[in-house]
Amino acid sequence: NVEIIDGGPVSFAKNRGAELVTTPYILFIDSDVRFFNVNTIRDAVDELESNNLDLVGLYVKCYDDDIRAQLGFMLFNAVNNIMKYKVPFAIGAFMLTRKEQFDKLGGFPEKFGTSEDFFLSKKYDVKKFKLVKHYFGQDNRRFQQMGYFGMAWYLIKNFWYRNNENYWKNLDYSKYWSAK
């Protein structure tokens, strides 16, 4: 069933959609995501069920010919693959979770303009999280908008200040969301 709900900031819209879910799992997929394998969703659900996980994510890959963006995503995947043992992070473009756990954790935090996926993911138990060995595809638009160094610096600062509420309150989100 498809139902159109009122929009708003990303966290708000995702939480309103999650309120409508009547199944044991919620799968958040951004509209511009592409898959490289037809079994990606099935394999993610299988991992969640067979390993009794609460949260499953994928690796990200650039689907256009931008070598710098491809390298940027590869570096991000490498860092996320190392950090997954300490801080779970399922990128919001593909995030599969148990509804019960999503509700228990309070859903996506609605007070920040970006990184809602990180703030929710880090609440999950690392033992109940897995990155499945599949990729979802993204284009290079964020790199184009913010510049390659700008995007890398943005991610580094966000990670560094991840526990600093004042940083997030004063962050200029327009650079991330604006169209070039």
Task: Show which residues each predicted segment covers.
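Active-site donor/metal-binding and catalytic loop motifs
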Residues: 132-148
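Glycine-rich, basic loop-to-helix element that forms the pyrophosphate-binding segment
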Residues: 5-21
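Acidic donor-binding loop at a coil-to-helix junction in glycosyltransferase catalytic cores
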Residues: 113-120
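Conserved donor NDP-sugar-binding/catalytic core segment of glycosyltransferases
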Residues: 38-68
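Conserved nucleotide-sugar donor-binding
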Residues: 22-23, 91-105
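Catalytic donor-sugar/metal-binding loop of nucleotide-sugar-dependent glycosyltransferases
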Residues: 121-137
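A recurrent flexible, glycine/aromatic-enriched loop bordering the glycosyltransferase active site
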Residues: 60-67, 78-97
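Short aromatic/hydrophobic "clamp" motif used to bind/position activated sugar donors
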Residues: 26
